[in-house]
Amino acid sequence: MGVPLFELTMNDRTISQQGTGKISILSPADLEIAEVTADPGVARTGASTDFSRMTPLPKGTRATVIGREGEWIRLDYGAWIQASEVQIVKDAVPARSIIRSARSRQVSGWTEVLFPLETPVPVTVQEGERTFTLTLYNTTAQTDIIRLDDDPVISRLAWQQISPLQVQYTFNLKSAQQWGYKLRYDGTTLVLSLKHPPANTSMMPVSPAKPLSGIKILIDAGHGGPQDSGAVSPVGIREKTVTLIVSKLVQEELVNRGANVVMTRVEDVDLDLPPRVEMIQKEEPAIAISIHYNALPDNGDAINTKGVGAFWFHPQAHSLAMFLHNYLVAKLNRPSYGVFWNNLAMTRPAVAPSVLMELGFTINPEEFEWIVNPTEQKKLAQAIAQGVTEWFASVK
């Protein structure tokens, strides 16, 4: 059809502007099929990293390309993805599927729900209050049977065809606290994995001396190494130094309570965000906590800005973020900076409730004195460990 021409008319005056792109009408036979090659593919609401993230697409997902903008591709279910994260599949059939069944099975620490499909279709998930909802796009149900045995996580499953090409599965859960999930394709079978609660959150008795016995906790000391010092105080002390000191103290306190603690770093070394995230994915801890200290831009109000902040992304991490924030503010008599939903690398892992704690502002002169005080650092570590302990007790 060619290049579009836009015209605006007002008060008998017309302004014309030629578009920067072309408009084409493609035959359905000419539509391209994109297959996700990244693990996972980052789906967004628009054609830029400025747009919000949607549920990541498992490697192998296929969808029809319905638009392009620069280095971005629009998929038929509504999301955009960078062209570098997909490959165009030649002579592929339209990415549509029939689903006839589903079944569950238990593996070590997880319940897997298998959805046999004809092609790997796009998916989204949503965590609710005692519910986990999975939506399959470009899918039509011809379902006769679903096997779902008694399970540590799932109490019941309901499903419905919510539109001609969308099937939605709602898992009713036995606990309000969710512990993590994973999505992958085995061939054309979608595998949804839901993590079981830590053994220590069951009704089994726990040793008062070791209340976190059997629980794996990942502690991330923010920043590190010569390339990433983090925030710098007025006297030159770097955030990376304090986060490591406090993280090691937290590790000691958690171990004393029986926890199995995994540290992303124990020395002043460079460690980019992707390896930290990969460690969470590999270790599959019960929870992950990233330790940081805050700062402001050069024009920020350093004198009047201070306090403890907590950040979460997935709903499963909200309870932990809120509990730790409130506990530290009350226990240590610290000001509150607030609790925030935030799309951060260290809050995005879905395999475990993952939070990032900003424990104070290094640029605030008064708070800085508290931050670097060894006695206060010890009290802070004890409060974090005790807060974690009491949170686990609260979600039984």
Predicted regions and their residues:
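Soluble non-cytosolic domains of exported or imported proteins
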Residues: 47, 51, 237-248, 267-274, ...
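Active-site-adjacent mobile loop/cap segments within catalytic or ligand-binding domains
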Residues: 283, 287-290, 294-298, 309-312, ...
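Active-site histidine-acidic residue metal-binding/catalytic motifs
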Residues: 196-279, 283-285, 297-300, 304-306
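C-terminal structured domain segments across diverse proteins
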Residues: 285-291, 303-335, 339, 370
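Solvent-exposed, polar/charged alpha-helical surfaces in well-ordered, non-transmembrane soluble domains
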Residues: 55-58, 240-248, 252-256, 278, ...
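Short linear recognition/processing motifs and adjacent strand/loop elements at protein termini
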Residues: 1-217, 256, 293
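Solvent-exposed loop/turn segments at secondary-structure junctions
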Residues: 223-226, 237, 267-271, 293-298, ...
